[in-house]
A protein has these predicted regions:
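Nucleotide-activated donor-binding/catalytic signature segment of Leloir-type glycosyltransferases, i.e.
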Residues: 100, 104-112, 282-310
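Active-site and donor-binding regions of nucleotide-sugar-utilizing enzymes
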Residues: 24-223, 244-246, 259-266, 273-274, ...
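Structural alpha-helical scaffold elements that stabilize or flank donor/cofactor-binding regions
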Residues: 124-126, 180, 232, 301, ...
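C-terminal alpha-helical cap of glycosyltransferases
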Residues: 408-431
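Acidic donor-binding loop of glycosyltransferase active sites
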Residues: 128-132, 305-335
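Catalytic binding pocket for nucleotide-activated donors in carbohydrate/polymer assembly enzymes
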Residues: 184, 200, 321-405
Length: 431
């Protein structure tokens, strides 16, 4: 039995309806900042230019690049199983839209998700009339979900995730989150911890088939650029600190200085989580009188370069292919960690900090397989890197274990999720 809509949600929806001028101002501001596509800005208001395809249409929503990467193999597998069905994929960022344009299979197409305004959402849903909706991970915009609840016959939350911080926030609004989650006919969590949190918040049954991100395709890379940089690096010992946050770059630079005592030709590559922080990392290197090159301003990697700052968007796949040792950030600073499957599938041994609540079971499985090691500070990080450089057999064993853990059960995860979803996908001959 569905619970009545809480007063707090009613107030939110009423205020958001009155805030259309604010929503339009926000869109204009984002457009000026380059965060919206000027040719497709109306999609953010729920206004489409392309026609709705005939027949069954399944809507899949993934907010950003990370969720988009998870969506691609899911859509591919669903299309294999149901070639008669079309798929509408929505995301909210320009980067993810570009990714969708490159990788979505035939029978699937992309639209920007409307802003969380009742009229924009209603316009979107009335135009596309999806026969089923699939939300990936944890974007719980009330107007979007509650609007879909009224107009989409079947709704499923897939790869559901609630961070510890969000869990504590939602526990202070139990009726609101329970009402939102009751919009879904089925909830499938990405791991046991998230299944427990979603069960607590929803008060219902939550399934768990494994993390859909395990099935995401490897990050793309320009093979010519990989070869060029590999030639530039030559035989120098080097390592990668990827997806780093403030505080972790200092640890990476301190690690570099520790290792330089034994490896004077060492090269450290830092790829910050947010590329716009490149200048900030340059300043840290300046403070240490380090020779550095900044990729975003075409800084050239030379034999004298001690630090290479990879502060460009969408190129992490290049550096994961280059380096066989990857420290994955977000775990020494308490950000919850980032996806270790990406470097593992591209041939890197994984080092990470203790705060990995976004990927708890993934890291646990990878450590249990011998593909990852936990480090808490620069001393432990330097020790781990030194050990892997010193012992090639240990390094190769760790790389193979990381790759094996990342690739295990991919087919099972996809098939289990597709089985659950296609039970809810109606057959329909016409539009």
């Amino acid at each position: 039995m569905r619970v009545p809509e809480p007063l707090g949600l009613k107030i939110y929806r009423t205020l958001s309806r009155a805030a259309e001028p604010v929503a339009n101002f926000a869109l204009r501001h984002r457009l000026q900042k380059g965060k919206e596509d000027p040719d497709r800005i109306d999609e953010r208001r729920g206004i489409a230019k392309r026609p709705r395809p005939n027949g069954t249409l399944i809507w899949i929503h993934g907010a950003s690049v990370g969720e988009s990467l998870s969506v691609i193999p899911l859509v591919q597998r669903l299309r294999e199983r149901r070639p008669d069905v079309n798929f509408l994929v929505t995301t909210g960022t320009v980067t993810s839209a570009n990714l969708m344009a490159e990788r979505l299979p035939e029978g699937a197409f992309h639209q920007y998700v409307p802003l969380d305004h009742p009229d924009f959402v209603s316009s979107f849903l009335d135009y596309w009339r999806p026969d089923a909706g699939i939300f990936v991970e944890s974007e719980f915009w009330p107007n979007l979900i509650l609007g879909a609840r009224q107009k989409v016959p079947k709704m499923t939350l897939v790869n559901g995730r609630v961070s510890p911080g969000s869990f504590e926030d939602w526990k202070r609004q139990p009726n609101s989150i329970k009402f939102i989650l009751s919009s879904f006919d089925a909830i499938i969590a990405q791991d046991y911890k998230n299944a427990e949190r979603l069960t607590t918040l929803s008060g219902g049954v939550v399934g768990m088939f494994g993390n859909l991100k395990n099935a995401a395709p490897p990050l793309p890379a320009d093979d010519n650029e990989v070869a060029r940089l590999k030639e530039k690096i030559g035989d120098r010992p080097f390592w990668l600190a990827a997806s780093t946050h403030p505080g972790e770059e200092e640890i990476a630079l301190n690690t570099h200085q520790i290792l330089r005592q034994d490896y004077p030709e060492i090269l450290t590559i830092i790829a910050p989580r947010h590329p716009g922080r490149g200048a900030e990392i340059c300043a840290l290197a300046d403070e240490r009188s380090m020779q550095f090159a900044q990729r975003s301003v075409n800084g050239e990697l030379t034999p004298e370069t001690e630090l290479y700052i990879a502060d460009t968007l969408g190129e992490l796949g290049i550096f994961y292919r280059l380096s066989d040792i990857a420290f994955v950030g977000g775990g020494i600073t308490p950000k919850g960690g980032h996806n270790p499957l990406e470097p593992a599938r591209l041939g890197a041994a994984i080092l990470h900090g203790p705060h990995t609540f976004n990927f708890v079971e993934t890291y646990n499985d990878m450590r249990a397989a011998g593909g990852a090691a936990l480090v808490r500070n620069e001393r432990e990080l330097a020790t781990a890197i030194r050990r892997l450089w010193h012992d090639a057999k240990t390094r190769e064993t760790m790389i193979d274990a990381a790759r094996g853990a990342a690739e295990s059960n991919v087919d099972k995860i996809l098939n289990d999720i597709c089985d659950a979803l296609l039970e809810k996908a109606p057959n329909k001959a016409g539009s």
